[in-house]
Amino acid sequence: YTAFFWIVCLVFATIFFTKEYNTGTIKLSVAYGTKRTILYYTKAITILAVSLITYLIFVAAFFVIEIIQSGYIPSASEALTLFGWALACGIVLLAFESISIFLCVIIQNIGVVTGICCLYVFSGASVYLMLWSNMDAASIPLKIFVYGNPMYYWMNFCSCRTMGIIEHLPFYFMGGILLLIVGGIAMSKKEIK
C-alpha cells in the first residue's frame, strides 16, 4: 500500500505545484515583487511538510487498526521504533517528491511528470527484482538506477532487510535537497508564461 500512497502524494504534489503556473496567477505575485525562488521554496516546503505529516498519520492509522485487531499493546520503545521507521520511510517519500517537484519545474506538465515518476517507481521495482540475486555483476548505471530508486528502499524495508538500507538514507536526504536547490536555480532562470 505504501507505493500507492506515493502515487497519491505524487499527484497531489504535481497538481499543487503546477496549478498557479498553469493558470497564470503566479504572475501577480511576481509583479508585486515576490521572487520566484521564494515562491518555489514556499510551495516545495509546503508540499513536503504536508506529505510527511499525511504519511505519518497514514502509518499511525494502520498502527492503531493493527493494535485493535490483534489486541497487542506495544511498549513505548516499540512504538518509538515504529515512529523512527515511519520517519525513515518519510525521508524516502520526500526524496521521491523532490524528484517530482524538480520535474515539474523542468517539464511543467502534470500528466508527463506523473507518468515519468510512476514509470520510475514501478520500473525500479521490476529491475530490482530481476537483479537482486546478482547485484554484484550488474553494470554501474543499473546499480545507480536501482539504489537510487525509492522502491529499492521500500522493498527491502518491507521484507525486513533493514540493515543494508539504512546507509542509503543520507543519499536520499541529500539527493532530495540537491534536487530542490537545482530546481530553485532553474526556477529563478525560467520565464513565467
Where are the regions that the model predicts?
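Secretory targeting signals
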Residues: 1-16, 40-108, 125-126, 133, ...
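Transmembrane helix boundary and interhelical loop/hinge segments in multi-pass membrane proteins
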Residues: 13-32, 36, 44
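Active-site-flanking alpha-helical
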Residues: 26, 40, 116
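Terminal transmembrane helical anchor/hairpin motif
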Residues: 73, 114-189, 193
